[in-house]
């Protein structure tokens, strides 16, 4: 057996499938039509130029002609210009950069910038490098440092049992070192590499250098030109293996560092056009084709596509005159075939004859799950994913060869507007090249992301042959050839495979044989605002319906007017279904002609029905249809009270990959459904997909979608629940996973439930006190247990600034149509550490369908450090923020300034997640709610019965800090008592806040005692004059005023406090340290410390004016602590900055030494006195405690206080103090990592979009 297995040849042809599409046979017939002369734009995560198979074409040309990042994720602001001094430049990182002597720079000026490597490293690479850096750079050194600190602490504890003040400090010092090292380990965070970037003009072209070694020795770094000039690229190191190229824009003011954002793009490019001269069996479909790599997946957004990236990409596609675009991306869209991005795609296709191939989506098996643009845009060829038996063996190592099938997850049509959705299918899996940074040569990936480049490569072969033979083609003729020659698989439905599996050789023959003018045209089919007839809801199929269909020819861009005039086409219209009636003929000229189609679905059985009305040129009927009108009808099953609103199926047989669809008319009043699946097989565990979709106009399918991938064990049971909309048809799909082996039998039931609330969203205003909502059990007996949970508070922001400007050279559409940006700036305060979700309500959830080019927000802290970013789908971009002030910058782009100006006051919201959820009390009648008595628990509601509920307001002390008027709390209302019902039937709740109650302060100054005598005006004047003099004393720096006031008011404490603050705040403070000490002593001497200590020791104060006394005592304590700290800081500064005098007399030296000892003794006394009154980590005391530690050379204690100072005031100077102490302690690894954080935490400006 083993011998037979090893002798069987390895199925190389199944690793990257070409046989199934006819690509292999085509290349056997025409080996030179291997993609030569064809340029494919790969719009993806970027292509690694160093990956296997990405170097040359079959005819020796560069495989990748250019590499462009259109997202802006690799952009570096290099607007700062500097000139070297002595051959050196100080980079924005603070490193000294040595300019090599052999660099040519006639102007002598360099543009400099800075970039954190983790800003553009792919996520997987970043995680790997972080792990490796910790293991190699941090852990070994840190373990030694921690062990040494623990050893010292233990030795001290053994040797010293005394509790003297000196020993106490030493013990604290050693303990601090251990605590700090443990804390650094817990808080370890790798800033990643920080690269200085230089750009200059050498007299002929722009050049760039990235200090990839981070040591300033630029002679060892790679100098690069724009990639398209010489196909140059560099690498960030042997550990990273991350290849990069550059592009320089705006006269050197902007550098784009281009890296791959993920492995996806390289894999896609390898499928389409990889070439291995030594291993041709590993070649992609079109090894002779060239590639234009365009990165549209923004690394900042986990490689999500953005409007900015896509529109810039289409500009590049047009400028490079690309023949093909492969786009293995897409999202669900609320309305198909519309939006700014789709308009630009249409322009590239219709006007510039670029064939746009895209993935249909990976959201099957339900119908109408095609993504945008692949399955929803008329100009785009959407490709479904097919899996062949050879692929199953070679790629997936299945034990058995199963019949060819569509992958379970491949998206299905039709589009929501009736278009077929999927155009063609191709193999949806491959083992192909991936970037070097993955440390793999190849990888298995599957998806319509893989079927699209397989089809795209096949089309490249066709175009290569057409170009070699000078055969004209258009996007319309090529698409028609693909669709009319594709092979339909009998066991795969039309909505999955489209017109069938692409056949390269047959499509080529078709185009060679059919060269008529009519075949070069496109035809737009419209049914009102739709592109097909799609009857899905019960009301649409209840009676026959007539549909007006418009058919209009689309001419290639450069068609002569004479050809348009002479155009006359005689068409035969056919339909192969009896339930559709259409005209038999149509005469078409250069205008839109309308026909009427009648659809009568009344006699159709339950389920799905599809047909087409096809238009044939009577002159060449064998060429296949010139256009098709797709018609889909869904006949839904009904459930009623007699069946308890259940739909049951028993002992249902499933083969591998088999799909069963059930269309059900959801009963009016149903709000959720429960599906129960039970296995009847005792020997086979099975993988199933449960999928349900309801379609609502102008809502993406994902808005009302349920999806669950599950493993069903032998004789096992699974129960799931999902929300439904009453009165509309729902598709419930249960599918056996495509790779499952053996057959299996199951029972399953779909059961509908309904608890209807009066409002689809509950809006509660706190001022109303009590809010009512009513509930009805609409179908059957239901157990109720209403519960309102609030999980976040939402803050609304208005822009503090709005700026509009024209964008750069990358943002000019054909015919010099300039794009503009508006940048809106918002500010908000984060009251405490927590998770936030920023979003722009007007624009969010819109991407391809948006009328604006893009939306991108970036959030910054008060030091302009980038904290996070997001775009169209806010739920994907939650982030954690510490307490502090933050700025949000939102970029919106459009071609028209007037449209941007309308948004200059655009609101923005920040949703703050509550650390603990809040609940609102719910009562069953108004009286109980009014009195705050018995709350509702649970009850059983019979069918059609109503029950009112009353919600009371949230107590004021529960309102989260920072929330106030203009904010609201967001959460949900659940009504069902069952866990499944709670999970599925959820009603949104908004609780709108009002101003907090006014609180009267204790010890109010307005409260006068009866015994207190009013001050006369003269006394008031004298006091006011005194206070005015004190105020001006600090401004004028006048000692005379102080002396005068001291004589007049010798016991007035605020005078001495003001004098102390005045001296301590002076510019020449260091020269007046002794005066500060004297001033502090004066303040201290005027406070009765005994009385203060006695007051603090009191447990309660029974006196009637206790609040006033407390206020006075608190002020005295604060003043005392402040004076002690200022005195201590002055004494410490005196010791820290004392300089020895060379050549000083012996007597002077002795005097200095005695003075120093006296000062040190005074400092120690002040320190211990301070500890009597307050904690050393009090904000006021931290600076003194820090300086006291420095004087005593206790750097562990100093660092402990310094880190606390950073937490209170995270300035660059405070961080530098920490770094200095780390170095003094010998913790160079901690210092190094912290130093690397500084340019990230304190960037010179906001990062560019």
UniProtKB/Swiss-Prot annotation:
Residue list for modification N6-acetyllysine: 401
Residue numbers of N-acetylalanine PTMs: 2
All copies of domain Peptidase S8, residue ranges: 9-508
Pfam families per UniProt: Peptidase_S8 (PF00082), TPPII (PF12580), TPPII_C (PF12583), TPPII_GBD (PF21316), TPPII_Ig-like-1 (PF21223)
Gene3D superfamilies documented for this protein: 1.25.40.710, 2.60.40.3170, 6.10.250.3080, Peptidase S8/S53 domain
This protein's UniProt keywords: Acetylation, Aminopeptidase, Cytoplasm, Hydrolase, Nucleus, Phosphoprotein, Protease, Serine protease
Molecular functions (GO terms): aminopeptidase activity; identical protein binding; peptide binding; serine-type endopeptidase activity; tripeptidyl-peptidase activity
A GO cellular component annotation in the UniProt record: cytosol
Subcellular location: Cytoplasm; Nucleus
Note: The limitation of proteolytic products to tripeptides is achieved by tailoring the size of the substrate-binding cleft: the two negatively charged residues Glu-305 and Glu-331 that are blocking position P4 limit the number of residues that can be accommodated in the binding cleft and thus create a molecular ruler. At the same time, they orient substrates so that the tripeptides are removed exclusively from the N-terminus.
Function: Cytosolic tripeptidyl-peptidase that releases N-terminal tripeptides from polypeptides and is a component of the proteolytic cascade acting downstream of the 26S proteasome in the ubiquitin-proteasome pathway. It plays an important role in intracellular amino acid homeostasis. Stimulates adipogenesis.
Name of the molecule in the record: Tripeptidyl-peptidase 2
Species for this entry: Rattus norvegicus (Rat)
